[in-house]
Regions:
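Active-site anion-handling motifs in enzyme catalytic cores
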Residues: 1-222
Length: 222
């Protein structure tokens, strides 16, 4: 919208993304009550989604090892959205042998499989659709952006962005080290927890407001 406004297009309405709206929850969407009683350091389940871009696989496995070490009381569930390659399967099986609380899920071809994210205390990872799904459920989700889609979602909802790619670059390639990314992620997790997940509370309010705009817009077209 900002781009269009800069081009003097004035008649604009922001209706949000339909995937934000779970019609069974949207009217009362808010931060899930599980965040009132638990913390990330408790014996919870953390879901980590895989990257879409192969060049970000080192980040993914670095993040898995980091989260397992940092939150050793937690169960870790790895979500593979487009299937698991033989190479990834071999790596994941080794990780599962090394870490008894680690498991993995193949979500390819299964929209219903997304419901497994609801078993997690939080989602962290690279998949935009995982991010959007968790937000639609009132779950805390930390997206590591691979492209502009996630950046746009977070800008619209007031959630801080964490990027792993060079901006303004024609070549897609990693731009930060694993250690730097891990530090950024840890600092953000500490921040949102200390603030009582305020960014997410505001984001859910914003989603509800966008939904009301969308309803009015659709009603005006009928």
């Amino acid at each position: 919208m900002r781009t269009l406004q800069k081009s003097n297009v004035k008649n604009l309405i922001m209706t949000g993304c339909p995937a934000w709206y779970d019609l069974s929850k949207i009217d009362s969407l808010k931060l899930d009550k599980k965040y009132n009683d638990g913390t990330i350091s408790d014996s919870v389940t953390i879901g980590i989604s895989d990257p879409a871009l192969p060049c970000n696989k080192p980040y993914f496995y670095g993040l898995v090892n980091f989260i397992v070490r940092k939150y050793h009381n937690a169960n870790i569930k790895l979500f593979f959205h487009r299937g698991i390659s033989k190479e990834d399967l071999a790596k994941v099986k080794l990780l599962c042998k090394k870490y008894s609380k680690l498991a993995y899920v193949d979500l390819s071809g299964s929209a219903e499989g997304f419901k497994q994210y609801n078993q997690c205390f939080l989602h962290i990872g690279f998949r935009v659709h995982a991010h959007i799904y968790n937000l639609s459920q009132g779950n805390v989700s930390v997206l590591i952006n691979e492209d502009a889609r996630g950046i746009g979602v977070n800008h619209a909802l007031g959630i801080e962005n964490i990027d792993c790619l060079l901006k303004n670059s024609k070549v897609i390639k990693p731009s930060v080290s694993n250690q730097i990314l891990e530090t950024i992620v840890l600092d953000y997790l500490r921040y949102i927890e200390k603030s009582g997940y305020m960014q997410y509370r505001r984001a859910y309010k914003q989603i509800r407001e966008y939904f009301n705009v969308a309803k009015s817009f659709i009603a005006g077209m009928i």
